[in-house]
């Protein structure tokens, strides 16, 4: 790669990240424009930006498209993300998380313990479910508990956000940053637990969650009242089983095929499509309702990830 081109690409990447930080609500535009700039430079440089000899068997736009769509963009990660989003949406629809939270509150000897259990559960769910969705599930429980016991809800909500964001980085399927990291560090699902014989990211994140639980317990320990909430009715446990199968399947696939191929993505996306089929047939949802669920998935992050893959790959 030409030395000057390297600096141009580095400058594009730095400006992109800076603008994403400043204008988070327009991050898709920032990454898309940066990716487009890199693609144009790649075409003009005829392989100088997009590394490798991919321009040998093909020429011009065909070679550029081949390299971008088959090498730079990590379709395995994208399929994992889409499939896990579908399963997460169905998991929330099932009301299982809310039911578990109700049970934790019921068995807690005091409000302080109940708060800690809710925060810990929020973190655990965020390990495998996108953190915004997790907070949307747990926030009503936290607000109802705060109102009933006349607690200030702000520290509780801050705790939910912190635990959710922290645990979102613990595994491959937790959050997009973990997926970007896994793509370029060549981490499999299991590598987040044990990497080259050493404990990995997951366990360090759990240490952080433990410290967070201790901190918030000190904050809420004076709340001695016995907490209670209205029990939720579970719609179905099938989404929970899909989630557990996804976790177990990813672990097995990572053990059998350490390299990041397409097997993990196809597996998770297949489970997600199976979940949609269950949602349509077993839950008797109309095509419009199924489409609404799909439409509400975080497609903006998919576009964001594609832009990141192109720019970082350059």
Language-model-detected regions and their locations in the chain:
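Hydrophobic alpha-helical transmembrane segments
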Residues: 6-11, 29-33, 78, 112-120, ...
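Transmembrane alpha-helix interface/packing and boundary motifs in multi-pass membrane proteins
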Residues: 18-25, 121-130, 161-173
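Membrane-helix interface "capping/anchor" motifs
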Residues: 20-30, 147-155, 282
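Juxtamembrane and boundary regions of transmembrane helices in multi-pass small-molecule transporters
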Residues: 23, 151-154, 158, 169-173, ...
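Membrane-interfacial helix-loop connectors
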Residues: 33, 37-53, 59-60, 70-71, ...
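Membrane-embedded alpha-helical segments and adjacent helix-loop junctions characteristic
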Residues: 58-154, 300, 304-314
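Alpha-helical transmembrane segments
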Residues: 73-83, 164, 195-212, 260-271
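Transmembrane helical segments that form the transport core of multi-pass membrane transport proteins
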Residues: 118, 245-314
């Amino acid at each position: 790669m030409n030395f000057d081109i390297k600096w141009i690409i580095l400058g594009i990447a730095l400006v992109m990240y800076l603008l994403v930080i400043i204008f988070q609500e327009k991050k898709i535009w920032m990454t898309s424009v940066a990716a487009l700039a890199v693609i144009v430079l790649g075409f003009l440089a005829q392989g100088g930006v997009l590394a490798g000899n991919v321009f040998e068997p093909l020429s011009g736009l065909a070679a550029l498209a081949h390299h971008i769509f088959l090498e730079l963009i990590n379709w395995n990660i994208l399929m994992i993300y889409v499939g896990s989003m579908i399963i997460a949406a169905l998991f929330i629809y099932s009301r299982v998380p809310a039911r578990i939270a109700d049970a934790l509150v019921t068995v807690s000897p005091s409000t302080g313990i109940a708060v800690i259990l809710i925060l810990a559960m929020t973190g655990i769910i965020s390990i495998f479910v996108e953190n915004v969705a997790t907070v949307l599930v747990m926030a009503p429980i936290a607000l109802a508990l705060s109102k009933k016991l006349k607690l200030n809800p702000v520290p509780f909500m801050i705790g939910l956000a912190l635990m959710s964001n922290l645990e979102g980085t613990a595994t491959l399927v937790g959050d997009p940053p973990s997926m970007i990291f896994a793509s370029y560090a060549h981490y499999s699902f299991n590598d987040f637990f044990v990497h080259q014989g050493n404990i990995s990211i997951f366990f360090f994140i759990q240490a952080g969650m433990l410290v967070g639980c201790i901190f918030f317990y000190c904050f809420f320990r004076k709340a001695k009242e016995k907490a209670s909430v209205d029990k939720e009715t579970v719609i179905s446990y099938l989404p929970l089983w899909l989630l557990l199968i996804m976790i177990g399947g990813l672990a097995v696939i990572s053990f059998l095929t350490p390299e990041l191929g397409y097997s993990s993505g196809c597996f998770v996306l297949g489970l997600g499509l199976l979940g949609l089929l269950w949602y349509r047939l077993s839950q008797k949802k109309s095509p419009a309702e199924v489409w609404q669920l799909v439409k509400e998935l975080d497609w903006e992050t998919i576009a964001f990830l594609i832009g990141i893959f192109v720019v970082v790959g350059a």
